[in-house]
Amino acid sequence: MALRRPPRLRLCARLPDFFLLLLFRGCLIGAVNLKSSNRTPVVQEFESVELSCIITDSQTSDPRIEWKKIQDEQTTYVFFDNKIQGDLAGRAEILGKTSLKIWNVTRRDSALYRCEVVARNDRKEIDEIVIELTVQVKPVTPVCRVPKAVPVGKMATLHCQESEGHPRPHYSWYRNDVPLPTDSRANPRFRNSSFHLNSETGTLVFTAVHKDDSGQYYCIASNDAGSARCEEQEMEVYDLNIGGIIGGVLVVLAVLALITLGICCAYRRGYFINNKQDGESYKNPGKPDGVNYIRTDEEGDFRHKSSFVI
């Protein structure tokens, strides 16, 4: 038979728990504490947003409020000395006692914001809370580059790039309005193709194009704020005319052979030699052979001496 503890003893056993609870509540009283209804707000660019910072417990009627912005490892004041500071001046205000509202947010407002409260009359004088603000920007029309014509078996690279979206968009490619997988081997529908798509850079690479890869291509850039696409561009895959290439090479070789043969025939018939001799046989007729003109110091004029060979 179990022994029952008298009611008075049960009450005494509960007294330590009661005193601990009172002690705990006494520690909380007079300690400033903060909370937020949303620590990770997300907003579209050019909209307004409220950064929630609420005082739940404090014995100080007029605590000091400060807001700071933490971005790129730098900390700057947003609200200090009861004034909006920095790049938020003119487009932000304090709601209630501590919350911060921002109008017309831009992508540069994406950062960590720290709400700090100093209550001099409280047991715990300081408390703070950090809020991460994300400003989303819809992508603009991406720039797409698609080769117009590629021979069968050659490599081809398609590019898609967008620079305005935030967070950075992901890219997807379409051929004839059919979405392409990141790897052609992952889908039996594209078993005749060999390509790989990098959804982060927007690059679509064909290791060796086939005739089935011909078609209309376009790219879509998308993030949580929206999406945008470029205009369709056609890529044609054509067969190489091996017979025509060989025939063209043979024609060129035949023409070169005929030119060489003609030059050799002209040289053998003496066309180049006769022209050279004709040029060397030409002499100046102004001075006949066998006549010497000598001028002496005694004569003022020329004296003619001649020798004749008969």
UniProtKB/Swiss-Prot annotation:
Organism: Homo sapiens
Keyword Nucleotide-binding: no
Tissues expressed in: Detected on round and elongated spermatids (at protein level). Highest expression in placenta, brain and kidney. Significant expression is detected on platelets. Expressed in intestinal mucosa cells. Expressed in the vascular endothelium. Found in serum (at protein level). Also detected in the synovial fluid of patients with rheumatoid arthritis, psoriatic arthritis or ostearthritis (at protein level).
Effect of mutating residue 219 to Y: In HDBSCC; the mutant is retained in the endoplasmic reticulum
Assigned GO CC terms: bicellular tight junction; cell-cell contact zone; cell-cell junction; desmosome; extracellular space; filamentous actin; Golgi apparatus; microvillus
InterPro entries attached to this UniProt entry: Ig-like_dom, Ig-like_dom_sf, Ig-like_fold, Ig_sub, Ig_sub2, Ig_V-set, JAM-C
Domain topic, free-text comment: The Ig-like V-type domain mediates interaction with JAM2.
Lipid attachment points (S-palmitoyl cysteine): 264-265
Lineage of source species: Eukaryota, Metazoa, Chordata, Craniata, Vertebrata
Topology Extracellular: residue spans: 32-241
Sugar attachment sites: 104, 192
Compartments it resides in: Cell membrane; Cell junction; Cell junction, Desmosome; Cell junction, Tight junction
Record keywords: Angiogenesis, Cell adhesion, Cell junction, Cell membrane, Differentiation, Disease variant, Disulfide bond, Glycoprotein, Immunoglobulin domain, Lipoprotein, Membrane, Palmitate, Secreted, Signal, Spermatogenesis, Tight junction, Transmembrane, Transmembrane helix
PANTHER family per UniProt: JUNCTIONAL ADHESION MOLECULE C
Gene name of the record: JAM3
Gene Ontology molecular function terms on file: cell-cell adhesion mediator activity; integrin binding; protein heterodimerization activity; protein homodimerization activity
Listed name of the protein: Junctional adhesion molecule C
